[in-house]
Amino acid sequence: MSVAFAAPRQRGKGEITPAAIQKMLDDNNHLIQCIMDSQNKGKTSECSQYQQMLHTNLVYLATIADSNQNMQSLLPAPPTQNMPMGPGGMNQSGPPPPPRSHNMPSDGMVGGGPPAPHMQNQMNGQMPGPNHMPMQGPGPNQLNMTNSSMNMPSSSHGSMGGYNHSVPSSQSMPVQNQMTMSQGQPMGNYGPRPNMSMQPNQGPMMHQQPPSQQYNMPQGGGQHYQGQQPPMGMMGQVNQGNHMMGQRQIPPYRPPQQGPPQQYSGQEDYYGDQYSHGGQGPPEGMNQQYYPDGHNDYGYQQPSYPEQGYDRPYEDSSQHYYEGGNSQYGQQQDAYQGPPPQQGYPPQQQQYPGQQGYPGQQQGYGPSQGGPGPQYPNYPQGQGQQYGGYRPTQPGPPQPPQQRPYGYDQGQYGNYQQ
């Protein structure tokens, strides 16, 4: 009826002026208000009358719009939408006479809009996953995906998983935020450099390590890893260049190095230890926090991140990442170097070499510290140095564990620390 009624109206109107359309829109707005009032007062009869009038106007407006676009075929559609929307959606839509438009757009927007965000998140997440670099860029969304990726990588890495979950101190979204923060913070501080460097490293790391895959996963998976690990890697490299960063990062490496053997032995446990021990650097406290779980520790570290500050967080991040990464690496190495872990540092070195990405990173470190093999000792040593720096920061108790696990490294630590 409404359609039939609208068409005659349109024909009867003849010329359609903007003023007439605006007036009708105003009338529709008034009708909507009346409908809402009627609904509130429980006057269903009046409400239905207003709805019919409103629907008629909307159909008419839709017809005008369609006729202007030569899309008479769509005429039925607006009425259909208008009917429901007019009575229901429109009434609630509120004054806007365009309610129909609103409703339709709302529907489209609501339907499409949210999907878009989701898709964006997915795409972002996906992109970040695939494009670790995007992660660095997009950070949050990508981080989200990254987190997802991290979670997966972490799942793959277990430690990472813990790490991711831990990292997600915020956990899940927070993780993203934290990760974002971690990346943002660490990356913000180191991130930019790490990111840029990292990207190169990333490529190298990713390429360097088939384990890198794991590493990548750390990067990709722990895309903060990526963001930071590579940065760590970079930082390790760059930072080793910058021993401070190197120290921070290296300590993580070191713990992994130190930890790796044990990590390898019981990376998870070792994680706890490593993180407790390996994390002796500032991470120690933090790592211990993180590492107590190894995962929660991360979560804690992230909290620590904020607490420690970007530098520390970065260190922690680096350590996390590295340790996390190392953990990953360690774990990865486990996978890679399950045997090497047993072998010990050299094996670890080998493991890292196995991870070659890691050695690459070590190389990054190595350049600072020396060849991969030597790096490794250097690494531990470098870490020792850096770690020493850390160690002072960290409580002795964790250190002793490191010492125990890393009696060898500790010597280095001692040397470096000195």
Swiss-Prot record:
Modification type N-acetylserine: residues: 2
Short sequence motif named SH3-binding, residue ranges: 392-401
UniProt region (Transcriptional activation), positions on chain: 2-186
Region annotation (2 X 13 AA imperfect tandem repeats) ranges: 344-369
Sequence motif SH2-binding, residues: 50-53, 374-377, 413-416
Composition-biased stretches (Pro residues): 394-403
Subcellular location: Nucleus
Implicated disorder: A chromosomal aberration involving SS18 may be a cause of synovial sarcoma. Translocation t(X;18)(p11.2;q11.2). The translocation is specifically found in more than 80% of synovial sarcoma. The fusion products SSXT-SSX1 or SSXT-SSX2 are probably responsible for transforming activity. Heterogeneity in the position of the breakpoint can occur (low frequency).
Quaternary state and interactors: Interacts with MLLT10. Isoform 1 interacts with RBM14 isoform 1. Isoform 2 interacts with RBM14 isoform 1. Component of the multiprotein chromatin-remodeling complexes SWI/SNF: SWI/SNF-A (BAF), SWI/SNF-B (PBAF) and related complexes. The canonical complex contains a catalytic subunit (either SMARCA4/BRG1/BAF190A or SMARCA2/BRM/BAF190B) and at least SMARCE1, ACTL6A/BAF53, SMARCC1/BAF155, SMARCC2/BAF170, and SMARCB1/SNF5/BAF47. Other subunits specific to each of the complexes may also be present permitting several possible combinations developmentally and tissue specific.
Protein name per its UniProtKB record: Protein SSXT
Organism: Homo sapiens (Human)
